[in-house]
Structure formats: C-alpha cells, structure tokens
Amino acid sequence: MFKKIAPKRFLFSLLLITAFIAITLFNLNEADKLFADIQKYISDSLGWLIILLANGFLVFVIYLAFGKHKNLILGGPDAEPEFSNTNWIAMLFSAGLGVGLLFYGVAEPVLHFSSDALHAEGASFSDKANRSMNLAYLHWGFHGWAIYGIVGLCFAYFTYNKNLPFRVSSFFSGPLTKNIWGRVSLDVIAIIATIFGIATSLGLGANQINSGLGYMEVLEESFTSTVGIVIVITLMGLISVVLGLKVGIKILSQMNIIL
C-alpha cells in the first residue's frame, strides 16, 4: 500500500495542512473572523459566478451524455461493469454525499428560510419557502451531481482509457504540467481541497451524531465526545478504504442504504 504513495505530493500536502491547522489553533479568534469574512466575501461577490459555473457543469454533463461522446466506454472498448447498478448507486450516495446530505437535507432549507438576508423585504411565506428549496436543490440536486460527475469522468477516462496516473494533474496538459513541480503543485492543491472538504462533512456528521446521542441521553454532548466520534468514523473509513472497493466501501455503502 505504501509503495503507491508519491513522496513529494504527500509530504508537501502534509506540511501545508499541518501548518494551517497549527496556525489556526493558536489564533482561533482571528482565524474564525478571517474565515467568516472570506465566506461573506465569496457569498456576496462571487455567488453569481458559483451559480453560473454550476449550471455550466450541468449543461456540459448533459452534452456528454447525449452528444458525440455518449458511446465512449470507460476502461476501453472491451471493458465490463465491475459492480451492479444497485451497488454503484449505494456507493455514490454513501461515499459521494454521505453525512452532508443526511445533515443538510433537512437543515439547509430551514436555515435558508430563517435567514432574512436571502429574502426580499415583505416576502410571503410561500416565496421564502420556494427560494429556500431552490437553493437546497442547487446544492444537493442535479447541479451537485454534475460537478461530481465531471471529476469522476476525468479520473476514469485519463486513468483507465489513457493509462495515466490516478492524479488531478493527469487531467491537464500544457506549460503548467511540463515540469514536475507544476504537476506536483496541481496535485497538492487537489489533496488539500479534498481533505478540507471531507473534514467539513465529517465535522457536520459528528456534531449531528453527538447531538442525537445527547438528546437520547446515551452520551454527554461535548467537544471531547465529538472528537471521539470523529476518530471512530475516521477509523471506519480508513479500514473501508484499505479493504478496497469490492469489500470495504461496497459493504459499508450497502449497510448505509439499508439504514
């Protein structure tokens, strides 16, 4: 397993993530304010761009599904599906959306509805409800799947059709990827983005589990118990990944769908 680790990419990613976490922990108040300001700036100034890009991804995926590339077989002309449709759907929902959908599927529309900043002054109950659901559908509907689908298709095509390494840098060509440091930089950025994206979903899920167990008086709701839940979930995920798609992730996904 360790032979497949790329030393440069792993070490640079580890150093940057560790440095970021350390700086944040030693400056919690300043970091909290900075993150809030960045989020507000992105929401206020670039919200239109995010929605435009999401729609662009959706249109592009529809084109790929029905355009001239619709008959392209991932893995080569003789490739056969490795999993049934049922198993694929289970893995997509469990590994793709997971606790994020479980937590925000209900919470997000409610949060949008209660936020006065998102609604025109004097908006009716139905207008607020419709706008709240529209935003939730943008995040958890076809648009989200289109974005995930593009990345998944890129990995599948360049890895299994073009026999390139399973890395984000394999998607690109040109001056940026002609030298090793250009390729490493792209992969490090992708690794950091993935880690923090997973951390967000994991944190939300751990908080939800902690809150539920606290409500049922099974476990005291506290920071320590949240950390313990994160560790348990992380270990389960790690074991699942080490066991591979055919055993770990497949079985865990099937259990999630049943639950």
Predicted feature locations:
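Generic secondary-structure boundary signal with a strong preference for alpha-helix termini
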Residues: 106, 110-112, 117, 153, ...
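N-terminal alpha-helical transmembrane segments of multi-pass membrane transport
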Residues: 1-125
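Helix-loop-helix module between adjacent transmembrane segments
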Residues: 3-4, 8-11, 15-25, 58-61, ...
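Juxtamembrane inter-helical linkers in multi-pass membrane proteins
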Residues: 78-81, 117-128, 165-183
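Membrane-water interface regions at transmembrane-helix termini and the short interhelical loops
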Residues: 1-4, 28-42, 61-80, 132-139, ...
